[in-house]
Amino acid sequence: MPKKEKKAKTPLSDEEQLLLFQQKLLTEEEMAKKKERLLSQFLKDKLAKEEHNSALNLNKINTQWRTVLREVKTRELHKDIEILSQTFERVVDCKDNVIKSLAKDLSEAEEQYARALRSHLHSVDQLLALQRHRLSLLEESYNMELEALTKEFETERKTIIDQHEKEIHYLQDIFMAMEQNYIDSEYESKLEFQSMWNDLKNMNLEEKHFLRLHLENIVEDLWRKFQDVLKNYTDATEDRKAAFETLQVKDEKSSKEIEVQMKKIQKLQDAITISKGKIMIHSRESEDENRYIRNDKELVLVQLRKLKAQRTQARAASQKNLVKLTLESNATLKALRKIVDKGEKILKLAEICRKFETEEEKVLPFYSSVLTPKEQEGIEENNLEELTEELAKVMVDYTGMENFWKRYNKVKLEQLSLQHRRAQLLDINGKLREMLKQYLDGISVSDEVLSQLNPLFIVNYQSNLPQPLSIPIAHPGDKQHPTT
């Protein structure tokens, strides 16, 4: 011990004191952290224990509270079920009575339906017979009109063809006569030209023959003189010179005579040219006449073409009218066939819909007008003011359809009323389904129900739902409407 005290009293250095102080701080920090960990663990355990105890207590409270609420809700539901059972029994009794009355009405309606069906079939047979008779009359009238039109067309066609043939023969005769006149005039002009040509030719030949004879005589004289001169030339030169001079003079005379003869020939040629000019003039005149004749011929041919075109147009128009007539007749037959098919379809639909008619409709199929006599007279006066003659004639043919349109309008009104009633019943059904859903949600427990407003959650005797609609208690005298 003394040794220890001695050691303790030994002085420590600064470093050792610093280390010792740091160790103390570390130990203190570790102790503080350990205390914090222990304290947090203690608090967590205590919190978990408290949560467990609170959940257990809450479950116990909910279990006990649910039993109390179920008992209260059970009593309320028993009361509601008793009321609903009473109303259901009353409704069932009413339905039974209605079924019995409907069965009785059904038997009576079947008897009336049989009677009405027999009368309706009889009337339908009469209408069909009337319609067939009308169709036969229409077909006969159509056939008669068609036959008359075909006869008229054939007669008109025959007259047009005869007229055309007559005109063709007439034009051919005119053409042949004009051609014969042209041939005759041409032949006469040729004869005249040939006669003039022969006359001129004969005159020319005569003048040539005369000149030739005259010139031959002159040449013979000259030849004789030349022989004499030649003979004399042989005799003496002087005589030849004198003879040469005389011959020269004679030559001049002969040249003058030749010039005179040439002038005559020129005159003859001028006469020939004049005659040729006359011939040309006659030929031009004949050409003009021929041109006029050709123009007349062309005009006649143009008229012939026009007549042919008119004939073809008339033939095409008649053929077009015939085709149009056949098409219209076929369209009329198809329209009549469609009307007959539509009538048969309407009759079939009437037979099918007859089983849906009520007893009143079978007994009185055509309802009387709901208008007063004054209102009916006012409507008729307004209709008469607005109607035209053609529309009045058309309406007379359809007076038998008034009863049909009455029944059609009645069925249309009943259809609209049933659609309106169906919409009302669907609305009531939706409301009842909503109420039933709310009721089932009130007696069932699920996550969806718990997430919504629920009458089971009651605090201080107050629910989180609004007050439910009070179910009316039916009395024996009240009328019950059937629900769908």
Swiss-Prot record:
One of its GO terms (biological process) is cilium-dependent cell motility. GO terms for cellular component: axonemal dynein complex; motile cilium. It is found in: Cytoplasm, Cytoskeleton, Flagellum basal body; Cell projection, Cilium, Flagellum; Cytoplasm, Cytoskeleton, Flagellum axoneme. Keywords: Cell projection, Cilium, Coiled coil, Cytoplasm, Cytoskeleton, Flagellum. Its main location: cytoplasm. The keyword Chloroplast does not apply. Residues 92-160, 374-403 form a coiled coil. InterPro entries: DRC1/2_N, DRC1/DRC2. Component of the nexin-dynein regulatory complex (N-DRC), a key regulator of ciliary/flagellar motility which maintains the alignment and integrity of the distal axoneme and regulates microtubule sliding in motile axonemes. Plays a critical role in the assembly of N-DRC and also stabilizes the assembly of multiple inner dynein arms and radial spokes. Coassembles with DRC1 to form a central scaffold needed for assembly of the N-DRC and its attachment to the outer doublet microtubules. Component of the nexin-dynein regulatory complex (N-DRC). Interacts with DRC1. Belongs to the DRC2 family. This is Dynein regulatory complex subunit 2.
